[in-house]
């Protein structure tokens, strides 16, 4: 019945990833101690039964995780509530089994189990909002229609759900079809037939719904944009599932609207995804019926010398509207033919440079900039590196000021098309001016805003970019801006390893040890985030950071961050050893037991408990270094928060049992001579005296406060 705790479980999940990752984390912790539970051999019938139940609960949880990594996204979206209930039942079963078994295992193992039980109780399993919305849309769709073919409205609803579930690429659709086929074969029922027909309609894209119109020469309504009532040249799908002409829906958003023009549903995601299949159908129909559809953006480009090219050059180079070059003149030709003077810079700084829907008056050729400029601009830095240096500075400042309070707009921008020119700009600024001046500050502020609004862009940052941040940390001028960026990066799964490999860790430690108070706390927050990585913890220990953390605790500064970092360092064997060997470290940690901040108390107890669980020698050191630890723990057990009470009681029990074992060993060693003697080479342990505990009515299980045996706290009567 022994479980192979090295068994691999899925690392990624198609759906309900937040719930699955929480369950996987808990299962991993249980499987690591399961061999120890088996070795404890709970011999009673109830113990064996509980062990079997725990085995079954683990198997069911792992089956759920495997299911969420392999099954159909659509099916899991529809049955999301059932899957959540299944996960909650699995968590409850694990909690119940561990709670029953911890009373029949040794104390050290009981403490480990208690920590897992506490974590199980505090863990809340939830579904992602987008998945709930997609499931709701599909369920409503399945209830609306019972016919074999889907109507256009149903297709729109399905597009909305498919976008939410990221079923927008051919590869994703093929994988989904295979998963659906497996489910249909397993169920052997007709209840899923309608769901399968909806999936097929994704590929047909409602072609059947309007087949008659296409064959009789009548222009299908689906080819027309709802906003312009004209045939679409570049159809795009928005997050509501409806399709529009790219230029028209972009204009709709530019005017400040944040809802779908058809469904009136408020949108959080303003991404525009090309409807390739519909465009292909439109092209085929137009070719068959002799209709020529013109690009609606052509009327916005006039190949005339009267145009103010300082305003139009950015939109000319942008790929957002696919503006054709009728004059055959390249961007380089424009740069060489038309100089950008100071008046052009002033127009850029006023926001006229990157307005995406630039309207040009046909009579005067002057640019008419909409006052309510877009929040969803695409590639605003396109062509940045082709401009003169002074113009680049103006452009970066213009974009920074425009999006300063609207980082949501960055979600729809391409990371590569935004980051590449901006990183190149920062490198050039570093080569031209070093780390001095406001030029780099503006670039770093813009980079921070972009990474904060578009977190997926962090994955595309190369290691050389992180090395550049390390250089900026060494500068007093831009260190604060670099720290702001590193704090964001340290919170991302792909950030910590690259930060460490770039050498920024030592720079952060230098800032912490410096006298720059305005930077110290921010550096501590970043280090706290980085300490969640075990590899970085080992490097922090090697750099002797624990001594600095100890001094912070003694000085009562940055205690909140310091104790969390120490807690993370304590998760490694090297960190535990260094904490016990660093002078005054244990005493400083124990002093936080008297803190008025529950979080600091809880983290301090967690560190001491981790140490006591690992080695008896650590328990002895805790008792020796931490004065009045017993009275502090008793006080917390009575007056602390519920979570702190549990941890304090467990730590108290561990310390008391170690003291009891020591007394028994001393008694046995003293019996042959009739009195206690100590050899010259033996270690002399100074007895720690504590006040007599309050006597209470003994429980059937154990005597003493909270069921603990406090004989070790009393003086032995000879």
Swiss-Prot record:
Annotated SUPFAM superfamilies: ARM repeat, RING/U-box
Keyword Transferase: yes
Reaction it catalyzes: S-ubiquitinyl-[E2 ubiquitin-conjugating enzyme]-L-cysteine + [acceptor protein]-L-lysine = [E2 ubiquitin-conjugating enzyme]-L-cysteine + N(6)-ubiquitinyl-[acceptor protein]-L-lysine
One BP annotation, GO: protein ubiquitination
InterPro entries with a match to the protein in the record: ARM-like, ARM-type_fold, RING-Ubox_PUB, Ubox_domain, Znf_RING/FYVE/PHD
Pfam families: U-box
EC number: 2.3.2.27
Biased composition (Polar residues): 676-686
A molecular function GO annotation: ubiquitin-protein transferase activity
Keywords: Repeat, Transferase, Ubl conjugation pathway
Record-linked Gene3D superfamilies: Leucine-rich Repeat Variant, Zinc/RING finger domain, C3HC4 (zinc finger)
Classification via CDD domains: RING-Ubox_PUB (cd16664)
Mapped ARM repeat ranges: 493-532, 534-571, 573-613
Broad EC category: transferase
Pathway linked to the protein: Protein modification; protein ubiquitination
Keyword Transferase: yes
Record domain U-box: where: 218-292
Domain of life of the native organism: Eukaryota
Stretch list, region Disordered: 662-704
Function: Functions as an E3 ubiquitin ligase.
Protein name as annotated: U-box domain-containing protein 5
Organism (species): Arabidopsis thaliana (Mouse-ear cress)
Name of the gene this protein is made from: PUB5
């Amino acid at each position: 019945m022994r479980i192979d705790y090295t068994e691999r479980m899925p690392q990624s999940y198609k759906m309900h990833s937040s719930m699955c990752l929480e369950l996987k984390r808990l299962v991993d912790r249980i499987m690591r101690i399961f061999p120890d539970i088996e070795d404890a051999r709970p011999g009673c019938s109830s113990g064996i039964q509980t062990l079997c139940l725990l085995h079954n609960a683990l198997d069911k949880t792992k089956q759920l995780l495997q299911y969420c990594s392999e099954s159909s996204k659509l099916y899991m979206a529809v049955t999301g509530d059932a899957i959540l209930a299944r996960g909650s039942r699995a968590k409850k079963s694990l909690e119940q089994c561990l709670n029953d078994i911890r009373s029949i295992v040794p104390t050290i193992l009981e403490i480990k189990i208690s920590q897992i039980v506490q974590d199980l109780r505090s863990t809340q399993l939830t579904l992602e909002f987008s998945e709930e919305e997609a499931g709701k849309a599909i369920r409503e769709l399945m209830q609306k229609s019972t016919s074999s073919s889907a109507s256009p409205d149903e297709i729109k609803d399905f597009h909305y759900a498919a976008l939410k579930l990221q079923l927008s690429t051919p590869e994703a659709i093929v994988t989904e079809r295979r998963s659906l086929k497996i489910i249909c074969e397993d169920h052997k029922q007709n209840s899923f037939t309608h769901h399968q027909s909806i999936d097929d309609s994704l590929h047909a894209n409602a072609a059947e719904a309007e087949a008659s119109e296409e064959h009789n020469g009548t222009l299908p309504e689906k080819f027309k944009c709802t906003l312009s009532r004209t045939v679409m040249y570049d159809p795009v799908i928005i997050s509501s599932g409806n399709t529009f002409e790219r230029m028209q829906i972009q204009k709709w958003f530019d005017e400040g609207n944040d809802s779908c023009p058809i469904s009136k549903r408020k949108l959080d995601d303003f991404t525009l995804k090309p409807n390739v299949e519909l465009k292909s159908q439109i092209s085929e129909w137009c070719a068959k019926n002799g209709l020529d559809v013109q690009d609606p953006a052509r009327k916005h480009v006039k190949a005339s010398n009267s145009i103010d090219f300082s305003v139009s050059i950015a939109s000319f180079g942008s790929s957002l509207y696919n503006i054709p070059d009728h004059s055959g003149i390249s961007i380089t030709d424009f740069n060489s033919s038309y100089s950008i003077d100071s008046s052009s810079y002033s127009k850029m700084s006023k926001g006229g440079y990157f307005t995406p829907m630039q309207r040009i008056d046909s009579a005067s050729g002057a640019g008419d900039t909409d006052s309510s400029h877009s929040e969803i601009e695409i590639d605003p830095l396109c062509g940045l590196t082709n401009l003169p240096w002074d113009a680049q500075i103006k452009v970066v400042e213009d974009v920074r000021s425009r999006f300063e309070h609207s980082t949501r707009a960055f979600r729809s921008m391409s990371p590569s098309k935004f980051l590449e020119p901006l990183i190149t700009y920062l490198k050039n600024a570093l080569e031209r001016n070093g780390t001095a001046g406001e030029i780099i500050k503006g670039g770093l502020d813009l980079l921070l805003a972009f990474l904060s609004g578009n977190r997926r862009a962090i994955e595309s940052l190369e290691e050389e970019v992180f090395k550049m941040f390390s250089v900026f940390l060494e500068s007093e001028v831009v260190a604060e801006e670099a720290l702001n960026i590193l704090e964001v990066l340290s919170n991302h799964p792909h950030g910590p390893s690259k930060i460490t490999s770039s050498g920024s860790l030592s720079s952060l430690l230098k800032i912490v040890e410096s006298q720059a108070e305005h930077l110290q706390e921010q550096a501590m927050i970043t280090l706290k985030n980085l300490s969640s990585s075990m590899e970085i913890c080992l490097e922090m220990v090697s750099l002797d950071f624990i001594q600095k953390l100890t001094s912070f605790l003694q000085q009562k500064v940055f205690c909140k961050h310091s104790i969390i970092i120490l807690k993370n360092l304590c998760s490694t064997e090297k960190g535990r050893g260094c904490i016990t060997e660093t002078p005054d470290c244990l005493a400083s940690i124990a002093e936080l037991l008297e803190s008025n901040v529950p979080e600091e108390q809880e983290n301090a107890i967690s560190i001491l408990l981790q140490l006591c669980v690992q080695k008896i020698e650590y328990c002895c050191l805790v008792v020796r270094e931490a004065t009045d630890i017993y009275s502090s723990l008793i006080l917390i057990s009575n007056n602390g928060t519920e979570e702190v009470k549990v941890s304090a009681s467990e730590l108290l029990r561990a310390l008391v049992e170690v003291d009891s074992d020591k007394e028994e060993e001393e008694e046995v060693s003293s019996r042959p001579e009739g009195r206690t003697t100590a050899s010259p080479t033996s270690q002399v342990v100074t007895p720690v005296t504590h006040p007599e505990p309050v006597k209470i009515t003994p429980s059937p299980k154990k005597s003493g406060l909270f069921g603990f045996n406090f004989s070790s706290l009393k003086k032995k009567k000879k």
